[in-house]
Amino acid sequence: MTTVRQVYEAMQVIAPLELAEHWDNPGLLVDCGGAVHRVLTALDITPEVVEEAAAKQCEMIVSHHPVIFDPLKRLGPQDVPFQLVRAGISAVCMHTNLDAAEGGVNEVLAGIFDMKDMEAFAEGCGRVGAIEEITVPQRVDADAHYAAL
């Protein structure tokens, strides 16, 4: 049985929290505990995403953007963290740490362009490198390849 904590720890191996920018709020932001059999991934956790996760019987959502970013001053039914707890769905959010991670967001984007001599900048949150000349049809074919992965 896979637990919330195990999924969270696995995500930290991929994108250690130490890579996050000081202003960011990544991590296990809503912990309902228990077993995880199904996970939904999303860029942002919105009320619609929570509804979809509940409909698909997911116990966890892994998102890029933090579901809690600013300090909470109140919590009510209109708030996504409240909706997650009510549905029993945990939330792991990996933002700038996933941007900066080896094999993370920016390395995947660099890979789409087949970037050469790639190096990190902005404390790891970006990548810069050389690309070869490419035509629009070649780019479309390459994008179709990545979309199929």
Which residues are covered by each model-predicted region?
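Hydrophobic structural segments
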Residues: 1-149
